[in-house]
Amino acid sequence: MATARVMVADRARAFGGTTATRARRDDQGRRVTIARGIPSRARVVVARASERAYAELGNVCAVLGSQWGDEGKGKLVDILAREYDVVARCQGGANAGHTIYDDNGKKYALHLVPSGILNENATCVVGNGVVVHLPGMFEEIDKLLQAGVDARGRMIVSDRAHLLFDLHKEIDGLREEELSGNKIGTTKRGIGPAYASKATRNGVRLGDIRDEERFATMLRALAADAAARFEGFQYDVEAEIVRYKEIAERIEPFIADTVEYINEAHDSGKKILVEGANATMLDLDFGTYPFVTSSNPALGGVCNGLGLAPRKFKTIIGVAKAYTTRVGAGPYPTELFGDVADKLRELGYEYGTTTGRPRRIGWLDMVALNYANLINGFTHLNITKLDVLSEMDELKIGVAYKLPNGKTTKSFPADIATLEKVETVYETLPGWKEDISKVRTWDDLPENAKKYVLRVEELAGVECKFIGVGPGRDAMVIKP
């Protein structure tokens, strides 16, 4: 019985619900409520809800962004990672910024290291679909170590993963300058050029770093190709080769055949959690092309980026903000301007984790969300930042588009010119004034907040199982 109480308390700490709380401000000025104290009746209720939620998820679970990124995937991954043996990244690179908080409210901004790194019992995997900037990865690893989090022995990187070099960043900037007035709005982290090297078959994979001579030859060829293509290209390839000799020694303990590792983990009954980067509406094939990322954040990219078969996935969680945001250029049907946009941006602190750029703000777009669900087949939804909508008199949800020809559609257009001209058809719902940042159970949410979540659930046809009500790890409501 004592053991059971300890398990309940431990699960409750992941999702909140305590007899006492203390509040502090994080380094961005946001209020973070931190749970403390002994298990209470409320905590037990939360713990039991979390146990039921865990039981539904199964051995292989993917957490994917369903909008334009920045939905809060890292927080859910960090929470769920306590129940999983393996936490894996499958695609993207350092253009994907994930912000997570530990039990003390300390913030960690991660770009390449999987969000499950705070779980001491989990092995973090960087899969073959990720493009890896090794100096940047080691910066993150070193910062984590300074904060008392040691990634050594707990993180492996695929020998098939392609390397992203500083020359790719240089190319990214030169390419953006070439586009002039038609800029994509790239993060200039070199992601697109790195994937281009992969596609044109002159990329360098992590496993190549083990052969010093071959690595040098491949990097020289890559630099020569870039110099021939871009007039203003500047890159000291010989200095980079010397630099990577030291990096090669340091990365060696992390290199592994992750395809074999993750499949053996699955076959032995271990639980695997996949952390998606970017989001479906930025998918190279399904997103608002060409205003997209250079990889496939949808479910297909998960399978390709890890070498894990589709039939092995039981749970696919789509993460969506209670409103929407977007960074960079591209069509955005529910975009808001003026006072409402400014208010939501400040309340939600909507600035890019990777770029620091102010995010564009919009109402929740169910046409886009249902499109993402169509592609991924979500089994559950995680609605995040519901607390940001507090204090609003009324809320709007985009439920359809009115096309330039006057017809109304609930399908997401592929044509960008059409998408830029659509008029959004909205439903209006009543808002709520209560502060919900300390709410930890469904029953304690204001009625109008419940109605909002239930309407999203109804429109999506998918259960909104997890509801984020604040930035802290404990600020999560599980819908019974």
From Swiss-Prot:
This protein's UniProt keywords: Chloroplast, GTP-binding, Ligase, Magnesium, Metal-binding, Nucleotide-binding, Plastid, Purine biosynthesis, Transit peptide
Cofactor dependency: Mg(2+)
Cofactor mode of binding and number, as noted: Binds 1 Mg(2+) ion per subunit.
Family annotation (Gene3D superfamilies): Adenylosuccinate Synthetase, subunit A, domain 1 (3.40.440.10), Adenylosuccinate Synthetase, subunit A, domain 2 (1.10.300.10), Adenylosuccinate Synthetase, subunit A, domain 3 (3.90.170.10)
InterPro entries: Adenylosuccin_syn_GTP-bd, Adenylosuccin_syn_Lys_AS, Adenylosuccinate_synth_dom1, Adenylosuccinate_synth_dom2, Adenylosuccinate_synth_dom3, Adenylosuccinate_synthetase, P-loop_NTPase
Binding site for Mg(2+): D70, G97
Protein name: Adenylosuccinate synthetase, chloroplastic
Organism of this sequence: Ostreococcus tauri
